[in-house]
Structures are given as C-alpha cells and as structure tokens.
C-alpha cells in the first residue's frame, strides 16, 4: 500500500498457504516480498504445511531451511490449540516489524482435530515503541533493502518475540538438574514421553521444560533465563 502515492485503503493482511514443494516454487516471490517488507498497517504470514514423512505430498519436507535463508521468522505451534493464537501473533509481529512470518504446521497437527476455547483470546500487549523504519518504502535500492532486513527488521522481531513471551517455560524448578528445550510439536511429545514413564511432575525430578515456539530467530535471552533459573 505504501508504494502507491495515494492509496485508497489503509492496509492489507495477506495469508499464503502451501506445502513444501509449493514453498520451493514460490520462494522467488516470497524472498522479494520479505526484502521489500510489509506496510505499517499490513502484514504477511506464510502458513507452511510440512509433511516430514511424505504422507500426502510429492516430497518429504522440512520448511525451516528455506524460510531461514530468506530471513523469515518461524512460528511453530505444538498442537491445534496454538494455531489460531500463534497465527494472530504472527500477523502482529509482521505488522510491527515489517517482516514476513512463517507459520509451520506439521501433518500430525493438520490431520488432527480439537475443540478449542477462544473466549479468553486477546491481542498481545506489544508494549514496544517503534524504534526503526522497518516498513516498505518506495524506490529502496536492493542493498539497502537487505541491510534493513538484517539490521532493523530481524532485531525488531526478536525484541517483539521476547517482550511478548511467545516462548514459554512450561515446567521448571529452582533445583533443576536437567533442562529440556523442545521445539513446536516436540514439546507435546516430550511431555507425553515423560508421562509414559511415570514422570507426571518433572519438576519433582529436577527437570525443566522450555517450549521453543519460535525456533528462528532463536531468542538467546529466553534460553539464558531458562538455564539460569
């Protein structure tokens, strides 16, 4: 919208969806979009359906490598309950930082169903002031766009993720002997595995679990805080 001299609307949110092979085909356009940036009242979210065993895709696929190569943050819901809240957070992050945001959904999550209570869902309190000029502008040279992405948008995105506590410490103890960092769906599987061997309250055994919902960019302050508890 900000590329027009006299736009007729304030902003547009866009949601792209595709499986892994579709992401491969679309990477040229996606890379250009992320280098250009979103408008201040817009937002771009890429919902990528990963099929790691090739159940219903032409190839087994993991999307992280492609998204990271384009400088796109990755949100990874652990289950059906997290898809909508994290999707809304992804849109807010995109609008705030001017960056595209990936939403990774694995086949196990996409093929499952659940009753989800959204009555308490509220927009996150950003609580941040915009410090940098991160949104798309007219006639920005290619090298300037790349510099903006890596020196302004990604640091802004990292601060948003940290301040809004998107990554979570699920179970912890002050006497931790073992810290488990689980990414996305592996968080649920880790808890199920501990339950299966009778460890229903990991903290009693000195075990802490950190749910990494944004595997890239990794928020080092979140990891340090978890390890220091």
Question: What are the residue ranges of the model-derived segments?
Answer:
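Flexible, low-complexity linker and terminal segments
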Residues: 77-229
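Thiamine diphosphate
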Residues: 1-95
């Amino acid at each position: 919208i900000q590329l027009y001299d006299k736009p007729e609307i304030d902003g547009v949110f866009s949601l792209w969806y595709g499986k892994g092979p579709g992401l491969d085909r679309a990477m040229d356009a996606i890379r250009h979009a992320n280098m250009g940036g979103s408008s201040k009242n817009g937002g771009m979210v890429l919902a990528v359906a990963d099929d790691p065993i090739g159940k219903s895709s032409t190839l087994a696929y993991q999307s992280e490598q492609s998204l990271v190569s384009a400088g796109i943050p990755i949100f990874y819901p652990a289950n059906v309950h997290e898809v909508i809240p994290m999707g809304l957070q992804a849109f807010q992050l995109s609008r705030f930082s001017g960056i595209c945001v990936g939403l990774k959904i694995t086949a196990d999550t996409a093929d499952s169903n659940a009753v989800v209570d959204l009555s308490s869902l509220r927009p996150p309190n950003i609580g941040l002031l915009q410090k940098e000029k991160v949104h798309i502008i007219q006639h920005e040279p290619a090298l300037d766009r790349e510099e903006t992405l890596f020196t302004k948008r990604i640091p802004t995105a990292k601060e948003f993720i940290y301040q809004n506590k998107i990554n979570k410490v699920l179970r912890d103890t002050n006497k931790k002997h073992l810290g488990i960092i689980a990414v996305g769906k592996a968080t649920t599987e880790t808890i199920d595995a501990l339950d299966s061997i009778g460890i229903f309250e990991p903290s009693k055994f000195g075990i802490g679990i950190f749910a990494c919902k944004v595997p890239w960019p990794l928020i080092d302050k979140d990891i340090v805080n978890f390890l220091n508890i």
